[in-house]
Amino acid sequence: MHIHMMNRDEHIAKKVEGSISSFSGETSTSSKQIYVNPVTTTGTKSMEDDDVSLSLLYNLSTLHEKVHQIQSLVSFYMVSTNNINQSSGSTSLAVANIGSLVQEIITAASSMLYTCQQLQIGSNNNNNDIDNDQTVDAMVLEFSRQETDPGHDFVQESTNLFGVQERGQISFPDQNLDWYNTETINPKKDKHRSKPSSGSYDILELDVADLLAKYTHYCQICGKGFKRDANLRMHMRAHGDEYKTREALISPTSQDKKGGYSLKKHYYSCPQHGCRWNQRHEKFQPLKSVICAKNHYKRSHCPKMYMCRRCSVKHFSVLSDLRTHEKHCGDIKWVCSCGTKFSRKDKLMSHVSLFLGHVPAHGSSKPPTITLK
Protein backbone atom coordinates (compact mmCIF):
# COMPACT_ATOMS: atom_id res chain seq x y z
CA MET A 1 0.00 0.00 0.00
CA HIS A 2 2.87 2.35 0.79
CA ILE A 3 4.44 1.73 -2.64
CA HIS A 4 1.05 2.30 -4.30
CA MET A 5 0.68 5.70 -2.63
CA MET A 6 4.19 6.69 -3.68
CA ASN A 7 3.44 5.83 -7.31
CA ARG A 8 0.23 7.87 -7.25
CA ASP A 9 2.07 10.93 -5.87
CA GLU A 10 4.66 10.61 -8.64
CA HIS A 11 1.86 10.40 -11.22
CA ILE A 12 0.27 13.59 -9.81
CA ALA A 13 3.60 15.41 -9.87
CA LYS A 14 4.06 14.61 -13.58
CA LYS A 15 0.83 16.48 -14.40
CA VAL A 16 2.29 19.80 -13.26
CA GLU A 17 3.71 22.10 -15.94
CA GLY A 18 7.34 21.73 -16.91
CA SER A 19 8.08 25.21 -15.53
CA ILE A 20 8.34 23.84 -11.99
CA SER A 21 10.62 20.90 -12.80
CA SER A 22 13.27 22.31 -10.49
CA PHE A 23 10.82 22.23 -7.57
CA SER A 24 8.88 19.04 -8.28
CA GLY A 25 11.40 16.73 -6.62
CA GLU A 26 11.32 18.54 -3.29
CA THR A 27 7.56 18.94 -3.38
CA SER A 28 6.85 15.29 -4.11
CA THR A 29 9.24 14.20 -1.37
CA SER A 30 7.65 16.47 1.22
CA SER A 31 4.17 15.41 0.18
CA LYS A 32 5.10 11.77 0.73
CA GLN A 33 6.38 12.52 4.20
CA ILE A 34 3.24 14.40 5.14
CA TYR A 35 0.39 12.49 3.54
CA VAL A 36 1.40 8.83 3.21
CA ASN A 37 0.31 7.05 6.37
CA PRO A 38 1.59 3.45 6.52
CA VAL A 39 -0.59 2.64 9.52
CA THR A 40 -4.12 3.60 8.41
CA THR A 41 -5.08 4.44 4.81
CA THR A 42 -8.69 4.52 3.57
CA GLY A 43 -10.25 5.34 0.22
CA THR A 44 -11.61 8.68 1.41
CA LYS A 45 -8.28 9.65 2.93
CA SER A 46 -6.49 8.83 -0.34
CA MET A 47 -8.82 11.08 -2.33
CA GLU A 48 -8.29 13.93 0.13
CA ASP A 49 -4.52 13.47 -0.09
CA ASP A 50 -4.69 13.64 -3.89
CA ASP A 51 -6.68 16.88 -3.75
CA VAL A 52 -4.26 18.42 -1.27
CA SER A 53 -1.25 17.35 -3.33
CA LEU A 54 -2.74 18.85 -6.48
CA SER A 55 -3.55 22.06 -4.62
CA LEU A 56 0.01 22.42 -3.30
CA LEU A 57 1.57 21.67 -6.67
CA TYR A 58 -0.78 24.04 -8.48
CA ASN A 59 0.01 26.88 -6.07
CA LEU A 60 3.72 26.14 -6.39
CA SER A 61 3.42 26.28 -10.18
CA THR A 62 1.59 29.60 -9.90
CA LEU A 63 4.31 31.05 -7.67
CA HIS A 64 7.05 29.92 -10.04
CA GLU A 65 5.26 31.40 -13.06
CA LYS A 66 4.43 34.74 -11.42
CA VAL A 67 7.98 35.21 -10.13
CA HIS A 68 9.35 34.79 -13.67
CA GLN A 69 6.79 37.29 -14.96
CA ILE A 70 7.81 39.83 -12.31
CA GLN A 71 11.47 39.37 -13.24
CA SER A 72 10.66 40.19 -16.86
CA LEU A 73 8.61 43.26 -15.92
CA VAL A 74 11.30 44.55 -13.55
CA SER A 75 13.92 44.17 -16.27
CA PHE A 76 11.67 46.06 -18.69
CA TYR A 77 11.10 48.80 -16.10
CA MET A 78 14.82 49.24 -15.46
CA VAL A 79 15.54 49.48 -19.18
CA SER A 80 12.67 51.92 -19.78
CA THR A 81 13.83 54.26 -16.99
CA ASN A 82 17.24 54.54 -18.64
CA ASN A 83 15.72 55.06 -22.09
CA ILE A 84 14.66 58.66 -22.65
CA ASN A 85 12.55 57.84 -25.70
CA GLN A 86 10.47 55.30 -23.76
CA SER A 87 6.90 56.47 -23.14
CA SER A 88 5.70 56.98 -19.58
CA GLY A 89 2.50 55.06 -20.34
CA SER A 90 4.31 51.76 -20.86
CA THR A 91 6.30 52.31 -17.67
CA SER A 92 3.20 52.94 -15.58
CA LEU A 93 1.53 49.89 -17.11
CA ALA A 94 4.52 47.74 -16.14
CA VAL A 95 4.36 49.02 -12.56
CA ALA A 96 0.63 48.26 -12.40
CA ASN A 97 1.21 44.74 -13.68
CA ILE A 98 3.93 44.19 -11.09
CA GLY A 99 1.52 45.17 -8.31
CA SER A 100 -1.12 42.79 -9.65
CA LEU A 101 1.37 39.93 -9.82
CA VAL A 102 2.49 40.57 -6.24
CA GLN A 103 -1.12 40.26 -5.08
CA GLU A 104 -1.47 36.94 -6.91
CA ILE A 105 1.76 35.68 -5.33
CA ILE A 106 0.49 36.61 -1.86
CA THR A 107 -2.79 34.80 -2.54
CA ALA A 108 -1.06 31.60 -3.68
CA ALA A 109 1.45 31.66 -0.82
CA SER A 110 -1.25 32.25 1.79
CA SER A 111 -3.29 29.37 0.36
CA MET A 112 -0.28 27.06 0.65
CA LEU A 113 0.35 28.22 4.21
CA TYR A 114 -3.25 27.57 5.22
CA THR A 115 -3.17 24.09 3.67
CA CYS A 116 0.06 23.22 5.49
CA GLN A 117 -1.34 24.40 8.81
CA GLN A 118 -4.48 22.30 8.39
CA LEU A 119 -2.36 19.28 7.48
CA GLN A 120 -0.19 19.78 10.55
CA ILE A 121 -3.24 19.98 12.80
CA GLY A 122 -4.72 16.82 11.27
CA SER A 123 -1.39 15.02 11.52
CA ASN A 124 -1.09 15.86 15.21
CA ASN A 125 -4.64 14.66 15.87
CA ASN A 126 -4.00 11.36 14.05
CA ASN A 127 -0.80 10.80 15.99
CA ASN A 128 -2.65 11.40 19.24
CA ASP A 129 -5.31 8.81 18.36
CA ILE A 130 -2.88 6.16 17.10
CA ASP A 131 -0.34 6.44 19.91
CA ASN A 132 -2.85 6.95 22.73
CA ASP A 133 -2.62 3.39 24.09
CA GLN A 134 1.15 3.24 23.65
CA THR A 135 1.57 6.55 25.48
CA VAL A 136 -0.50 5.38 28.43
CA ASP A 137 1.47 2.13 28.69
CA ALA A 138 4.76 4.04 28.51
CA MET A 139 3.65 6.42 31.26
CA VAL A 140 2.59 3.55 33.55
CA LEU A 141 5.85 1.73 32.91
CA GLU A 142 7.92 4.85 33.52
CA PHE A 143 6.07 5.73 36.70
CA SER A 144 6.76 2.23 37.98
CA ARG A 145 10.46 2.77 37.24
CA GLN A 146 10.46 6.06 39.07
CA GLU A 147 9.54 4.25 42.27
CA THR A 148 12.85 2.34 42.12
CA ASP A 149 14.85 5.14 40.48
CA PRO A 150 13.77 8.53 41.89
CA GLY A 151 16.39 10.43 39.93
CA HIS A 152 15.00 9.37 36.56
CA ASP A 153 12.98 11.86 34.49
CA PHE A 154 10.73 10.57 31.75
CA VAL A 155 11.64 12.28 28.48
CA GLN A 156 10.09 11.55 25.12
CA GLU A 157 11.69 11.96 21.71
CA SER A 158 9.28 12.97 18.97
CA THR A 159 9.57 13.98 15.35
CA ASN A 160 7.82 17.10 14.14
CA LEU A 161 6.41 17.90 10.70
CA PHE A 162 9.80 18.68 9.21
CA GLY A 163 11.49 15.47 10.42
CA VAL A 164 13.41 17.17 13.26
CA GLN A 165 13.63 15.23 16.49
CA GLU A 166 12.48 17.03 19.62
CA ARG A 167 12.84 16.17 23.29
CA GLY A 168 10.38 17.16 25.97
CA GLN A 169 7.58 16.08 28.25
CA ILE A 170 4.82 13.79 26.99
CA SER A 171 2.59 16.21 25.17
CA PHE A 172 1.43 17.01 21.69
CA PRO A 173 1.66 20.77 21.34
CA ASP A 174 -0.42 22.38 18.65
CA GLN A 175 2.38 23.96 16.63
CA ASN A 176 1.55 26.50 13.95
CA LEU A 177 3.53 27.86 11.03
CA ASP A 178 3.23 31.38 12.37
CA TRP A 179 4.93 34.09 10.29
CA TYR A 180 2.22 36.64 10.97
CA ASN A 181 1.48 39.04 13.81
CA THR A 182 -0.16 38.03 17.08
CA GLU A 183 -2.98 40.01 18.61
CA THR A 184 -3.30 41.07 22.23
CA ILE A 185 -6.69 41.11 23.87
CA ASN A 186 -7.70 43.73 26.43
CA PRO A 187 -9.98 41.97 28.95
CA LYS A 188 -11.45 45.29 30.14
CA LYS A 189 -12.69 46.12 26.64
CA ASP A 190 -13.77 42.56 25.83
CA LYS A 191 -15.87 42.40 28.99
CA HIS A 192 -18.18 45.11 27.65
CA ARG A 193 -18.28 43.76 24.10
CA SER A 194 -21.73 42.46 23.25
CA LYS A 195 -22.00 39.14 21.44
CA PRO A 196 -25.22 38.27 19.58
CA SER A 197 -27.10 35.16 20.63
CA SER A 198 -26.00 32.02 18.80
CA GLY A 199 -29.45 31.28 17.37
CA SER A 200 -29.95 34.68 15.73
CA TYR A 201 -27.26 34.43 13.04
CA ASP A 202 -25.41 32.03 10.75
CA ILE A 203 -21.62 31.72 10.70
CA LEU A 204 -19.88 31.74 7.32
CA GLU A 205 -16.19 30.87 6.99
CA LEU A 206 -14.61 31.91 3.70
CA ASP A 207 -11.47 30.35 2.27
CA VAL A 208 -8.16 32.18 2.32
CA ALA A 209 -8.25 32.59 -1.46
CA ASP A 210 -11.65 34.29 -1.23
CA LEU A 211 -10.49 36.63 1.53
CA LEU A 212 -7.39 37.65 -0.43
CA ALA A 213 -9.22 38.00 -3.75
CA LYS A 214 -9.41 41.49 -5.19
CA TYR A 215 -13.18 41.32 -5.71
CA THR A 216 -15.98 39.74 -3.69
CA HIS A 217 -18.98 40.11 -6.02
CA TYR A 218 -19.02 39.19 -9.71
CA CYS A 219 -21.47 39.85 -12.51
CA GLN A 220 -22.99 36.58 -13.73
CA ILE A 221 -23.40 37.98 -17.25
CA CYS A 222 -20.06 39.57 -18.12
CA GLY A 223 -17.93 38.35 -15.20
CA LYS A 224 -16.77 41.79 -14.04
CA GLY A 225 -15.80 41.93 -10.37
CA PHE A 226 -16.76 44.41 -7.66
CA LYS A 227 -15.81 44.90 -4.04
CA ARG A 228 -19.32 45.76 -2.83
CA ASP A 229 -22.77 44.40 -3.59
CA ALA A 230 -24.16 47.90 -4.20
CA ASN A 231 -21.63 48.52 -6.98
CA LEU A 232 -22.65 45.25 -8.62
CA ARG A 233 -26.33 46.22 -8.58
CA MET A 234 -25.53 49.59 -10.17
CA HIS A 235 -23.47 47.81 -12.83
CA MET A 236 -26.34 45.45 -13.67
CA ARG A 237 -28.32 48.37 -15.09
CA ALA A 238 -26.17 48.22 -18.21
CA HIS A 239 -27.44 44.71 -18.98
CA GLY A 240 -31.10 45.56 -19.53
CA ASP A 241 -34.17 47.40 -18.34
CA GLU A 242 -35.14 44.58 -15.98
CA TYR A 243 -32.17 45.55 -13.78
CA LYS A 244 -33.18 49.23 -13.67
CA THR A 245 -36.32 48.75 -11.59
CA ARG A 246 -36.51 49.87 -7.98
CA GLU A 247 -36.79 46.28 -6.77
CA ALA A 248 -33.60 45.29 -8.61
CA LEU A 249 -31.64 48.18 -7.09
CA ILE A 250 -32.75 47.52 -3.50
CA SER A 251 -30.48 45.38 -1.36
CA PRO A 252 -31.75 41.80 -0.89
CA THR A 253 -31.55 42.26 2.88
CA SER A 254 -33.87 45.27 2.71
CA GLN A 255 -36.32 43.33 0.56
CA ASP A 256 -36.41 40.48 3.07
CA LYS A 257 -37.12 42.89 5.93
CA LYS A 258 -39.86 44.65 3.96
CA GLY A 259 -41.47 41.36 2.94
CA GLY A 260 -41.56 40.07 6.48
CA TYR A 261 -39.09 37.23 5.98
CA SER A 262 -37.21 36.29 9.15
CA LEU A 263 -33.85 35.38 7.65
CA LYS A 264 -30.88 34.99 9.97
CA LYS A 265 -28.13 37.53 9.72
CA HIS A 266 -24.79 36.34 8.37
CA TYR A 267 -21.63 36.74 10.42
CA TYR A 268 -18.18 35.60 9.41
CA SER A 269 -15.39 33.53 10.92
CA CYS A 270 -11.65 33.79 10.35
CA PRO A 271 -10.25 30.59 8.74
CA GLN A 272 -7.03 30.82 10.76
CA HIS A 273 -6.98 28.06 13.38
CA GLY A 274 -6.38 29.40 16.90
CA CYS A 275 -7.47 32.95 16.05
CA ARG A 276 -9.82 34.73 18.45
CA TRP A 277 -12.22 35.35 15.55
CA ASN A 278 -12.29 31.68 14.51
CA GLN A 279 -15.58 29.93 15.27
CA ARG A 280 -13.77 27.03 17.01
CA HIS A 281 -12.17 29.37 19.55
CA GLU A 282 -13.65 29.21 23.05
CA LYS A 283 -13.94 33.04 23.16
CA PHE A 284 -15.14 33.43 19.59
CA GLN A 285 -16.28 36.87 18.43
CA PRO A 286 -17.92 36.91 14.96
CA LEU A 287 -16.97 39.37 12.24
CA LYS A 288 -19.89 41.47 11.02
CA SER A 289 -19.27 41.64 7.26
CA VAL A 290 -17.13 40.36 4.42
CA ILE A 291 -15.11 43.59 4.46
CA CYS A 292 -14.40 43.11 8.17
CA ALA A 293 -13.30 39.52 7.54
CA LYS A 294 -11.02 40.52 4.65
CA ASN A 295 -9.39 43.40 6.54
CA HIS A 296 -9.00 41.32 9.71
CA TYR A 297 -7.24 38.49 7.88
CA LYS A 298 -4.91 40.87 6.05
CA ARG A 299 -4.03 42.84 9.19
CA SER A 300 -3.54 39.82 11.46
CA HIS A 301 -2.28 36.98 9.29
CA CYS A 302 -0.60 38.53 6.22
CA PRO A 303 2.80 40.20 5.82
CA LYS A 304 2.90 43.99 5.84
CA MET A 305 3.82 44.71 2.23
CA TYR A 306 3.09 48.46 2.11
CA MET A 307 5.69 50.82 3.59
CA CYS A 308 5.29 54.53 4.20
CA ARG A 309 7.59 56.49 1.86
CA ARG A 310 7.82 59.45 4.22
CA CYS A 311 9.04 57.85 7.44
CA SER A 312 10.18 54.46 6.04
CA VAL A 313 9.23 52.97 9.40
CA LYS A 314 5.56 52.09 9.35
CA HIS A 315 4.44 49.02 7.39
CA PHE A 316 0.86 48.02 6.59
CA SER A 317 -0.89 45.02 5.06
CA VAL A 318 -4.01 46.99 4.03
CA LEU A 319 -3.58 49.75 1.48
CA SER A 320 -6.26 51.97 3.04
CA ASP A 321 -4.34 51.92 6.34
CA LEU A 322 -1.28 53.24 4.53
CA ARG A 323 -3.32 56.02 2.93
CA THR A 324 -4.70 57.04 6.32
CA HIS A 325 -1.22 57.07 7.85
CA GLU A 326 0.24 59.16 5.03
CA LYS A 327 -2.28 61.93 5.67
CA HIS A 328 -0.58 62.91 8.94
CA CYS A 329 2.85 61.27 8.67
CA GLY A 330 5.62 63.83 9.01
CA ASP A 331 3.27 66.68 9.94
CA ILE A 332 4.33 67.61 13.46
CA LYS A 333 1.80 70.19 14.64
CA TRP A 334 1.79 69.82 18.43
CA VAL A 335 4.94 69.87 20.58
CA CYS A 336 5.37 69.68 24.36
CA SER A 337 7.93 71.72 26.30
CA CYS A 338 9.79 68.47 27.01
CA GLY A 339 10.36 67.94 23.29
CA THR A 340 7.78 65.20 22.71
CA LYS A 341 5.96 65.65 19.41
CA PHE A 342 2.35 64.75 18.63
CA SER A 343 0.30 64.73 15.46
CA ARG A 344 -2.97 65.53 17.28
CA LYS A 345 -3.89 68.21 19.79
CA ASP A 346 -5.85 65.89 22.11
CA LYS A 347 -2.80 63.63 22.45
CA LEU A 348 -0.68 66.61 23.48
CA MET A 349 -3.24 67.74 26.06
CA SER A 350 -3.44 64.25 27.53
CA HIS A 351 0.34 64.21 27.83
CA VAL A 352 0.42 67.64 29.50
CA SER A 353 -2.23 66.63 32.04
CA LEU A 354 -0.22 63.58 33.10
CA PHE A 355 3.11 65.28 33.83
CA LEU A 356 3.57 68.23 36.18
CA GLY A 357 5.34 71.23 34.67
CA HIS A 358 4.77 70.17 31.08
CA VAL A 359 3.12 72.78 28.87
CA PRO A 360 2.54 73.10 25.14
CA ALA A 361 5.52 74.59 23.37
CA HIS A 362 5.33 78.07 21.88
CA GLY A 363 3.24 78.11 18.73
CA SER A 364 1.97 74.53 19.05
CA SER A 365 -1.48 75.64 20.22
CA LYS A 366 -2.03 77.61 17.03
CA PRO A 367 -3.79 75.86 14.19
CA PRO A 368 -1.61 75.10 11.18
CA THR A 369 -1.62 77.70 8.45
CA ILE A 370 -2.68 76.68 4.96
CA THR A 371 -1.12 78.44 2.00
CA LEU A 372 -2.84 78.36 -1.36
CA LYS A 373 -0.71 78.43 -4.49
Curated annotation (Swiss-Prot):
InterPro entries to which the protein is assigned, alphabetical: STOP1/2 (IPR044300), Znf_C2H2_sf (IPR036236), Znf_C2H2_type (IPR013087)
Gene3D superfamilies reported for this sequence: Classic Zinc Finger (3.30.160.60)
GO molecular function: DNA-binding transcription factor activity; zinc ion binding
Coiled-coil features, chain-numbered ranges: none
A Pfam family it matches: zf-C2H2_STOP2_3rd
Tissue spec: Expressed at low levels in roots (e.g. root tips and lateral roots), leaves (e.g. at the edge of mature leaves, possibly in hydathodes, and in vascular bundles), flowers (e.g. floral filaments), stems, siliques and cotyledons.
Domain of life: Eukaryota
GO biological process, one term: response to aluminum ion
Gene Ontology cellular component list: nucleus
Alphabetic keyword roster: Metal-binding, Nucleus, Repeat, Transcription, Transcription regulation, Zinc, Zinc-finger
Compartments in which it is found: Nucleus
Chain positions of all zinc fingers (C2H2-type): 217-239, 327-362
Protein function: Probable transcription factor. Together with STOP1, plays a critical role in tolerance to major stress factors in acid soils such as proton H(+) and aluminum ion Al(3+). Required for the expression of genes in response to acidic stress (e.g. ALMT1 and MATE), and Al-activated citrate exudation.
Protein name listed in UniProt: Protein SENSITIVE TO PROTON RHIZOTOXICITY 2
Organism: Arabidopsis thaliana (Mouse-ear cress)
Lineage of the organism: Eukaryota, Viridiplantae, Streptophyta, Embryophyta, Tracheophyta
